[in-house]
Amino acid sequence: MATNRVFELRNWVYVSAALGLAGCTTVGPDYKQPMAPQVAGYTTQALPAQTAATSGMALGGSQRFVAGQAVSAQWWESFGSAKLNALIEQGLQASPSLAAAQATLRQAQQSYAAQAGSSLYPQVDANLGALRQRTNNSGFGQSGGEHIFDLYNAGVKVSYNLDLFGGNRRALEALAAQADYQRYQLEGARQTLAGNIATAAMAQAQYAAQISATEAILGAQQSQVDIAHKRFTLGAIARGDELSLLTQLEQTRASLPPLRNQLQQTNHLLAVLVGEAPGAATIPQFSLSDFTLPADVPLLVPSELVRQRPDIQASEALLRAANAEYGVAISKSYPQINLSATLGSQALSTSSLFGPGSIIWSLVSQLAQPLFNGGLKAGVNSAQASFDAAAANYQQSVLQGLRNVADVLRALDNGAETLQAQAAANNAAEASLKLVQQQYLLGGLSYLQLLTAQQQAQQTRVNLVAAQARRLTDTAALYQAMGGGWRSNEE
């Protein structure tokens, strides 16, 4: 008999839930994906098919823009540096910022799972209780005096919320979108970390090369000062000429500490990026010769870019969440129906539990319909405003992404031309310095002309190194601007 009642109650709850779901509707608008950017290119002026080339110059090769080329998930490997590859992999494994992003993603996923478990399925709870009580019949005008008895109960309660108007489902949509947002944030953090390590390694190589170039110039200037001192001792030149050359020497020497400081700070940055303390890290030393310049670089069309950039995808996830929250706000104006059933046993002894005459049960259905609640309309309006803000933020993220790509593409094109010009300037400055030094030693030119030639040679050499490094960092920035290829791991 008790078993039959269990089946009856269980079937009643499941059938009621099934009937409720069959008649469910989901209030609020269904999400519609925004249109892709309706533009063919990133800049008003068409890009050349490839960048300028500087023959005979390291990192001076031409780069070809390949339309539609997929971005590799390990795009940093295109620079051909095993040291860089190892450092980035170390950072991806050990970075605390990535660990925090991963934990936040797990939190969002578990929030969704918790809500799904309580919204989609009936809740089943078991209870077991024991009571010992004394009563005094004389207090009720009855004979018999006091009476002590035990009461035991055990039972199961099943409850279910009929989501007739989809409020729970919209809430799940919002939580799923929030989990997606955190997933895209994690992917964005990975790409940012890889990009920061790559550009920091390239900056380290740049500063090291500029220090080396400056030290070479410093050595040449020291030789000129030594010669000038001998000539002054012999009375061939005035003391002022010697002091002018010495001033130039010390000015060149003074430019070294700032470069060393930049190099050291870059090493500290690299240590933190790979999850180590600056004082305990062993950071590899990079040179510009450690890197190769990719000959082919990807160029996605704008309509595909929005799918590839994690920041744009994260912004769209927030838009989906806002759309779902709008549906949740609307659903609060509709009836809420809750069903519950209880089956149990109550007896004066444990041996009598679930015996004849001990079974108790209940069936309950509750309907709540808001009749007057001034806050509901305001809640809907608030959710609508939140959706409008999310839509505007999404459009802004798309525009920022397009601008980012446009800036990097122009930087690549102009950077190649800059290197070409800097290489020519450096060749001319070095040739001029050699000629001026020879003529100065022969007495044909003044020390002022020598100083000018030295200054030009120093500055053009430093600028040349910066232009070489800039081609590397601009290329890394393009890979990031194109989304970093993170979807390659998904697909």
Q: Where are the regions a protein language model picked out?
A:
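Outer membrane beta-barrel translocator domains of Type V secretion systems
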Residues: 123-161, 167-178, 182-184
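Sec/SRP-type N-terminal targeting helices
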Residues: 99-100, 162-190, 240, 244, ...
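Small/polar, glycine/serine/threonine/aspartate-rich low-complexity segments that form flexible
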Residues: 63-79, 130-157, 280-298, 327, ...
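A short glycine-centered flexible hinge/capping loop motif at secondary-structure junctions
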Residues: 232-236, 440-444, 481-485
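Periplasmic alpha-helical coiled-coil/stalk elements that build and connect Gram-negative outer-membrane
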Residues: 168, 177, 184-301, 411, ...
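Membrane-embedded beta-strand positions in outer-membrane beta-barrel channels/transporters
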Residues: 88, 153-157, 201, 302, ...
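Transmembrane beta-barrel architecture of outer-membrane proteins
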Residues: 26, 84-86, 151-153, 199, ...
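Terminal intrinsically disordered/low-complexity segments used for targeting and assembly
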Residues: 2-93, 152, 176, 260-307, ...
